[in-house]
Amino acid sequence: MALNLKALLGMLFVFIGCCSNVVFLELIIQIDPGAGNLITFAQFLFIALEGLVFTSKFFTVRPKIALKDYVILVALFFGANVCNNYAFNFNIPMPLHMIFRSGSLMANMIMGIVLLKKRYNLRQYSSVAMITAGIILCTLVSSGDVKDNTHHSLKVDTSYSDFFWWTVGIGLLTIALLVTAYMGIYQEVIYKKYGKHPSEALFFTHMLPLPGFLIMAGNIVQHFGIAWSSEPVAVPLLGAIGLEWKFPLMLFYLLCNVVTQYVCISAVYVLTTECASLTVTLVVTLRKFVSLLFSIIYFRNPFTLNHWVGTILVFFGTILFANVINQVRDAYRARSSRKTHFDTAPLAKKVE
């Protein structure tokens, strides 16, 4: 399949933006694991402001998609993001978080069967079984090494065990997975009705939920205080005269996380309009795998043989679901067929 320059750049920025975003996310949660709401709010605010200026042009551009459809989409998108980021406050390690979110195909299949009455073949059921088994294995292995990750300034005495809060985190990830799957189905319905408008969708799905963060204002302010009081890092302003500016390290990581999140999600939106769903699935899955490896190696996260088995099941289950082997084989055969045709064409002319 030939890819245009826009699609290739989209793939490149998915890896640059999304992989670096995960790095800065992990750097933040190492300082303050409960900063999920702060991170989500900062990401939504930045992307909404960018869209207000460049996409909506301060609401002077008429939206192509009805606002009532955006409201439903936004409620799903907001809920999924809050659950995913808030899960870090419940003893969920980064590798498990990434592996669990890789179960999106499984969730999509469940939603497809329940809501759209879809039927799937044996290969698809087998692949989802592999993905499910991989996630369950990694989850069970991680449950044996649960520890309290709450920031020291927020610790409270409680009779509940760390394991209980870990199960709450798993519950949040499960809800986020199912909500994201339903959101994908609803998004597909909207795009069929109105056409694809990625920049507009990106703006409205981040602008409309902003009032919802008022519910979490206390939590956001609390963790912003932790970020503000984090270890300062020297930022050179005028190197020639040696002028430096002290900036809180966690706020620096947060700024980098917000910018890379914008690059990441913008690139994914571009891919959805330029490539087939198979290509998007493969790129996103490979990106998650690269991020996982980096998290294990660079941040020295605990990763046992069972974790590797679970990861391999998830990764190859995704490849099987996307039917990559058959797609590559068919593409190779088509290419060989065209080459054979061109090679024999001159001989045919000579015979004539």
UniProtKB/Swiss-Prot annotation:
One of its GO terms (molecular function) is UDP-N-acetylglucosamine transmembrane transporter activity. GO terms for biological process: GDP-fucose import into endoplasmic reticulum lumen; GDP-fucose transmembrane transport; UDP-N-acetylglucosamine transmembrane transport; UDP-xylose transmembrane transport. Its main location: endoplasmic reticulum. It is a multi-pass membrane protein. Belongs to the nucleotide-sugar transporter family. SLC35B subfamily. It comes from Drosophila melanogaster (Fruit fly). Sugar transporter that specifically mediates the transport of UDP-N-acetylglucosamine (UDP-GlcNAc), GDP-fucose and UDP-xylose. Functions redundantly with Gfr in the O-fucosylation of Notch, positively regulating Notch signaling. Involved in the biosynthesis of heparan sulfate-glycosaminoglycan (HS-GAG) and in Dpp signaling in the wing imaginal disk. InterPro entries: SCL35B1-4/HUT1 (IPR013657). Pfam families: UAA (PF08449). The keyword Transport applies. A motif (Prevents secretion from ER) lies at residues 350-352. Disruption phenotype: Homozygous lethal. In a weak loss-of-function phenotype, a gap in the fifth longitudinal vein of the adult wing is observed. GO terms for cellular component: endoplasmic reticulum membrane; Golgi membrane. Keywords: Endoplasmic reticulum, Membrane, Sugar transport, Transmembrane, Transmembrane helix, Transport. It is found in: Endoplasmic reticulum membrane. The chain crosses the membrane at residues 9-29, 34-54, 70-90, 96-116, 126-146, 163-183, 201-221, 249-271, 276-298, 305-325. It comes from the Eukaryota. This is Endoplasmic reticulum GDP-fucose transporter.
